[in-house]
Swiss-Prot record:
Cofactor (UniProt): pyridoxal 5'-phosphate
Primary location recorded for the protein, binned into one broad class: cytoplasm
Family that this chain belongs to: Belongs to the class-I pyridoxal-phosphate-dependent aminotransferase family.
Subunit comment: Homodimer.
Modified positions (N6-succinyllysine) in chain numbering: 82, 413
Keywords in alphabetical order: Aminotransferase, Cytoplasm, Lyase, Pyridoxal phosphate, Transferase
A GO biological process held by the record: response to bacterium
Residues annotated as binding substrate: 36, 185, 398
Source species: Mus musculus (Mouse)
Name recorded for this polypeptide: Kynurenine--oxoglutarate transaminase 1
PANTHER family named in the record: FI04487P, KYNURENINE--OXOGLUTARATE TRANSAMINASE 1
Gene this chain is encoded by: Kyat1
Listed GO MF terms: cysteine-S-conjugate beta-lyase activity; glutamine-phenylpyruvate transaminase activity; kynurenine-oxoglutarate transaminase activity; protein homodimerization activity; pyridoxal phosphate binding
Pfam families: Aminotran_1_2
Catalytic reactions on record: L-kynurenine + 2-oxoglutarate = kynurenate + L-glutamate + H2O; 3-phenylpyruvate + L-glutamine = 2-oxoglutaramate + L-phenylalanine; an S-substituted L-cysteine + H2O = a thiol + pyruvate + NH4(+)
């Protein structure tokens, strides 16, 4: 065909590191600690809810309401309304989407116009930038700044902080949206109330919307508390809060997400949704509705999955932190999420010439080397930064610790073999 096939809005966003690292992980015999999914079963009540949805009411095989299965939007409005301090209308304040990815894409398409600026806090999940660009917006990046831990001590995700002056400098008359992710992927940073108040004050001062990606909100450790920015004074009316059933109930394949916010904003998302996806799978929504109804009854009690999951994953996190240190990796202790990052600076000094393209960041070459030579997969943290900042943050790799005990034991065996081998 003589005409250009690719739409201009796709220029510069065609490369996806997840595709490459998924392919490598399948080509080699690896323990997959790169991709963020549990390799253990969802809780029994969730499995039973899904089974019931597929074998019970035959009408669950048909379309449901376009903006969400009514029992699901009702329980989401009730459950999160209490947490956010809002009387939420299931029909006006909640939209069910194909995963949190779908919620984000719908929000960007609905609200970002040509030339609008979108502030993205780095490191950031790497869909925010291409979604901004596909909508015609211009991403504006601000990096969390690291205050190194004292020598001999492990660092923490809390060591990464916003510089208030730098953040304020990113706001211009063209700024439309700030994207917030707490707990943060890949750092595992849980933004404090003080940090959220800084973001909230700037959003209100400059009349900017906030997209708050909170898919890991139940996975917080060591007594840290997740705070939804929409719960702060003056923020409900300018915030879209995004959640994920897959992350909440360890069932990422269900692909059920949601977005919540004020009706005057949500109505534009409904316009995009009804002209693209229109309906999400009914049976998965029915299962998620049952799961939340169960959690509402048990919320705050030891029987709540939202308490049990972080307790179990906190142990996994501690196990991985101890194990990774045995080969010279330096993990940073995460406050939340599925992930931790590890500093590979010592390897960069002792093994600087790993195979790979000259323009490839060191952490990308290291992650590929580790897959091929050590049988362990992780994700280079430079992929969570904009192109100009890749080389500044090329000495970290991200591991997922939300894994089965057998997977962690397999990791230990690979690390034990690695420990007994020469580095190169």
């Amino acid at each position: 065909m003589s005409k250009q096939l690719q739409a201009r809005r796709l220029e510069g966003i065609d490369h996806n590191p997840w595709v490459e690292f998924t392919r490598l992980s399948k080509e080699y015999d690896v323990v997959n600690l790169g991709q963020g999914f549990p390799d253990f079963s969802p809780p029994d009540f969730a499995v039973q809810a899904f089974q019931q949805a597929t074998t019970g009411n035959f009408m669950l095989n048909q379309y449901t309401s376009a903006f969400g299965y009514p029992p699901l939007t009702k329980i989401l409005a009730s459950f999160f309304g209490k947490l956010l301090g809002q009387e939420m209308d299931p029909l006006k304040n909640v939209l069910v989407t194909v995963g949190a990815y779908g919620a984000l894409f719908t929000a960007f398409q609905a609200l970002v116009d040509e030339g609008d600026e979108v502030i993205i806090i780095e490191p950031a999940f790497n869909c925010y930038e291409p979604m901004t660009m596909m909508a015609g917006g211009r991403p504006v990046f601000v990096s969390l700044r690291l205050s190194p831990a004292p020598k001999g001590q492990l660092g923490s995700s809390n060591d990464w902080q916003l510089d208030p002056t730098e953040l304020a400098s990113k706001f211009t008359p063209r700024t439309k949206i700030l994207v917030l992710n707490t707990p943060n992927n890949p750092l595992g940073k849980v933004f404090s109330k003080k940090e959220l108040e800084l973001v909230a004050a700037l959003c209100q001062q400059h009349d900017v919307l906030c997209f708050s990606d909170e898919v890991y909100q139940w996975l917080v450790y060591d007594g840290h508390q997740h705070i939804s920015i929409a719960s702060l004074p003056g923020m409900w009316e300018r915030t879209l809060t995004i959640g994920s059933a897959g992350k909440s109930f360890s069932a990422t394949g269900w692909k059920v997400g949601w977005v919540m916010g004020p009706d005057n904003i949500m109505k534009h998302l409904r316009t995009v949704h009804q002209n693209s996806i229109f309906h999400c799978p009914t049976q998965a929504q029915a299962a998620v509705a049952q799961c939340f109804e169960r959690e509402q009854q048990h919320f705050g009690q030891p029987s709540s999955y939202f308490l049990q999951l972080p307790q179990a994953m906190g142990l996994n996190r501690d196990h991985m932190i101890q194990s990774l240190q045995s080969v010279g990796l330096k993990p940073l202790i995460p406050q939340g999420s599925y992930f931790l990052i590890a500093d590979i600076s010592d390897f960069k000094s002792s093994m600087p010439d790993l195979p790979g393209a000259m323009d490839e960041p060191y952490d990308t070459r290291f992650a590929k080397w580790m897959i091929k030579n050590k049988g362990l997969s992780a994700i280079p943290v430079s992929t969570f930064y904009s192109q100009p900042h890749h080389k500044d943050f090329d000495h970290y790799i991200r591991f997922c610790f939300v894994k089965d005990k057998a997977t962690l034991q397999a990791m230990d065996k690979r690390l034990c073999s690695w420990k007994g081998e020469p580095q190169a």
